[in-house]
Amino acid sequence: MSELLLELFSEEIPAFMQKNAEKGYLNVFTKIFEENKIFAKVKVFVGPRRITLHATHLPKVTLPKDTAIKGPSLNASEAAINGFCKAHNVSKLELFTKLINNQLYYFFIKKTEEREIKEILPEIIIEAINKYSWTKSMFWGDYNIKWVRPLRNILCIFDGEILPMQFGHLTANNITYGHRLTDNKKIEVENFEDYKNKLSENHVILERTKREEIIKAGLLELANSHDLTIKEDNRLIEEVSGLTEFPVVLLGRIPLKFLELPKEVLISSMRRHQKYFCLFDKAGNFAPYFLFVSNGRFVNAELVIKGNEKVLAARLADALYFYKQDIAKTLESNLSKLLAVTFHVKLGNLREKVDRITNICNYIAPNNKDLIMAAKLCKSDLVSEMVGEFPDLQGIMGYYYAKHDGLDEEVATAIKDHYKPQGLSDNVPNGNAALLATADKIDSLVGLMIAGEAPTGSGDPYALRRQALGIIRIIIENKLELNLNDLINFSINLYKDSSDKNKDLIISFLKERIKFYFKNNYDISLINAVLDLSAEDLVSVSLKLNTLQKFLAEDAGKQLLNAYKRASNIIGDQKITGLVDGNLFTTQSEKELFAVMQKILPQIIDSITDKDYERVLNLLSSLLAPITSFFGNVLVNDPDPKIVQNRLSLLQNTCELFHKIAKFNRL
């Protein structure tokens, strides 16, 4: 069995693309090998400047392969059939037919003789390199090849020998390179073991997972040695492992004067911008230290530490300056600046948006002074110096500035949390923050839909799907008593150019997002049954789904559903009009069914008002016996058309009782 070693050596590959490339190239090479009847054990390694493939257990030769080649249909013209035969150098006698989608087609078997693996590997490798699709890629120079970053070298060795291969301007060789900063020299290798060892000797750790383990261990060791703690941050560890070929963890100091900054500013400056790790004391307070990952072990580590301390100090000095500039003003004084910030070219400026949000909040919770104050100031930090420099701190800085202005904690928290949730994994806000978040998201959703920014299959630039899901989650998880239709109507009326068409579009869009929210926990037919009755009260929708799912899973629920379906099937699409007339009953079963209906109707209405859907289903269950008796003893058809109509009305009214909780005809 043979071994293949391939290294694509390039300029720096973006860290966030590396893990996907590792998985992607593994899948691509594995699939292409299998398609060519080459069964090998494949591994892929990725780092800042290289993607490496190691394949073992390759055969020396390929297996003979028979491939069925599809031709024209049996009804095709003689010229088309002859053309197919000529193109593939076969006679018509060699063709056979095969049925595909009720249509017969001509086929022939193309036989591929066994070939030496090394003869076909170059074309397979080039196909695989091109087949993986990077998130972003580029051309460079005059070369007609496209990759994530300019390729500088290709190493390709098969069974200890260079595999003759040309990719664009590059010819395969047996050369790799060591660490960019400390050992950037040509290194000749013979096989994978030699390759891996020589890279290690020249300060390159090939395996991504091993680099991550080294970083984790280094972080913990330094944190523990200073009696400090570090919060788990696997995403940042993964990112810095993609920036370093030989990671070494070092510790730097933060001047104490910068600790007066809000902790989120420190974290944003360090984590997001510098890729540094924050440290905390045992009480959870921010410590005046940070950890960072150096790309290599240098003789003068102190010089490296001083350099990183200097870079961080400069960034924090800017942040401290911005912070002091901002707290010299009040949030309220920033309101006039919002006039100069466009929300959307068709929807006006941010000050107008703030006014709409405030109106919606006043509609949702009249006389809630804290909520109205939070609504009025919720966007004021967007024009602050700090948020201008650190956009990810929107809302958070509003919280600190509100506290500095002497506003209540409830107001400050609402300003901070009103952007939540920012994804499925994010918690929803509560209290006034939940109401403010709902108002903000409703205004954005309604306004942007009116402006023609509805999501399409190819994009959702304003994240309206996420906004809608946020509204749904906030209402359900906070059990907010809000009528979604009324809320949309109110919001639409705050815009001058709106119409019923806009309302229908928005409600339809929200309904689809409601289905998306529930689809993982409930059958779509049950979701449709509940939503087709009403999607206005999301708390009720959630309670109904939960109650109905449990009920219909039981034997009693299944029996009641079957009884409903018997009644519903008899009515079908008929338009039944007229009241039930007790004087037209001719059987005891009719009388009993009608009596039970009249008895439970007011109780069902009261239970629905109280959202006691379990009681509603228990009341409906009392119809099972009389419905069963009706179908056992009564024929709907009768010589007297009045009696027929009355019986149909009785069944219609029976079904309508079920429809007070859900459209059972959708189940």
UniProtKB/Swiss-Prot annotation:
Any single GO BP term: glycyl-tRNA aminoacylation
SUPFAM superfamilies: HD-domain/PDEase-like
Recorded catalytic activity of this chain's protein: tRNA(Gly) + glycine + ATP = glycyl-tRNA(Gly) + AMP + diphosphate
InterPro entries recorded: DALR_anticod-bd (IPR008909), Gly-tRNA-synth_bsu (IPR015944), Gly-tRNA-synth_heterodimer (IPR006194)
Compartment annotation: Cytoplasm
GO cellular component: cytosol
Keyword line: Aminoacyl-tRNA synthetase, ATP-binding, Cytoplasm, Ligase, Nucleotide-binding, Protein biosynthesis
Keyword Nucleotide-binding in record: yes
Molecular function GO labels: arginine-tRNA ligase activity; ATP binding; glycine-tRNA ligase activity
EC number: 6.1.1.14
Family: Belongs to the class-II aminoacyl-tRNA synthetase family.
UniProt subunit comment: Tetramer of two alpha and two beta subunits.
Protein name: Glycine--tRNA ligase beta subunit
Organism of derivation: Rickettsia canadensis (strain McKiel)
Organism taxonomic ancestry: Bacteria, Pseudomonadati, Pseudomonadota, Alphaproteobacteria, Rickettsiales
